[in-house]
Amino acid sequence: MAGNKRVRDAESEQDHAETETVVKDTATTGEVEGSFSDLKLSDGTMKAIGKMGFTQMTAVQTRTIPPLLAGKDVLGAAKTGSGKTLAFLIPAIEMLHSLKFKPRNGTGVIVITPTRELALQIFGVARELMEFHSQTFGIVIGGANRRQEADKLMKGVNILIATPGRLLDHLQNTKGFIFKNLKALVIDEADRILEIGFEDEMRQIIKILPNEDRQSMLFSATQTTKVEDLARISLRPGPLFINVDSEKDTSTADGLEQGYVVCESDKRFLLLFSFLKRNQKKKVIVFLSSCNSVKYYAELLNYIDLPVLELHGKQKQQKRTNTFFEFCNAERGILVCTDVAARGLDIPAVDWIIQFDPPDDPRDYIHRVGRTARGTKGKGKSLMFLTPTELGFLRYLKAAKVPLNEYEFPTNKIANVQAQLEKLIKSNYYLHQIAKDGYRSYLQAYASHSLKTVYQIDKLDLAKVAKSYGFPVPPKVNITIGASGKTPATKKRRTKD
């Protein structure tokens, strides 16, 4: 990457909520801390861990696995990419093994996670870990075939990975689903589960599940009041609070090189196109703020012979799953996506995270960049696009302990394909329509940002934004701004469609 680099320090304190009933055990390093062979695990688990290529534990595994093996409840705070999936699966599998769980005993462990992709990923890790065990495992997620799931549950699934909505559905409606013998409950990405609106479902699930002699573990990248409330109703009194991040200098992975570029709206796509062209041999994830923007830019880039994959919430589950695994297995390539891919997904060897549309807040930023530099020795780079009016976001990142460099790209290295882009959008009816949808959705997403002091829609230059979607003049679109549903006259754009 060319250009000057001005290092900006980003250090400040980050508070973690504490409750009186919680025992503190704080590790201050994310370095490798111990060996799996020290844990005295079953032969089947050790064989699987060896086959997966792991010998040393990460900090969160070192701190978490021994108390979980001893039967304690754990409330874990660890940044994304810290290795927590193994930290909760290994003790769960060991418990099922020691209790000699059979299919007829029903479900002994339930893992609840916010998204279908994350559930599939945890399921994949569980499948590898259980290769040499006799216990059964399964997954229930929205969008999958409910009847097939019910059939498997009735045959007996010892360890079940689930999203909240579908799990509640089966708990309430699937006769023959045996969960009375539940021994452990894992709630992963608890803050995200609550953020996306599953608070009521979680309360109902916890009410239905047996809690006598049940071990519980709750993991959350951030500790909020709602997470504390969920911990209070799901964990036994006096859980062990394990925080491997509280005294670290940064909130992001150590092997992550992070930067931002200041770019006017009309030059954003040209810079992105130039960057992707030069990095076609790398593995890159590009984040956008809306499904329609993803659809447009993915279609456009593929049309102009820059092959990309797309992942967003409007796709059918099978398509999302196929795309996710295709990108996982690729040595290089570009994935254009919404935040559906930002949380917890473990995609191997990602070189670059590009935040083309800005994240809503520092937490979203941290989870987006968490797709690279994963594990103990992970390396990766991230680049965030900001317009001159959005630079206030850097203050929030600094307060969240995110270290950033500023990158400058020489203008002579940026491909000037604006005229060709506008000509293409004008002549291709389909691209014209999805460009218009993308433009409208970008404005709508911008208007709904929570950091109103940073992302001010009145300060957007619509003519420049339109150019990044291939329009010489802003198209007429209709968006709703603000809680009142009223659209300021200066921003009102009516459309006939």
From Swiss-Prot:
A GO molecular-function annotation: RNA helicase activity
Keywords: ATP-binding, Helicase, Hydrolase, Nucleotide-binding, Nucleus, Ribosome biogenesis, RNA-binding, rRNA processing
Binding sites annotated in the UniProt record for ATP: A78, K79, T80, G81, S82, G83, K84, T85
Cited InterPro entries: DDX18/Has1_DEADc, DEAD/DEAH_box_helicase_dom, Helicase_ATP-bd, Helicase_C-like, P-loop_NTPase, RNA-helicase_DEAD-box_CS, RNA_helicase_DEAD_Q_motif, SPB4-like_CTE
Keyword Nucleotide-binding tagged: yes
A Pfam family recorded for this sequence: CTE_SPB4
Protein name: ATP-dependent RNA helicase HAS1
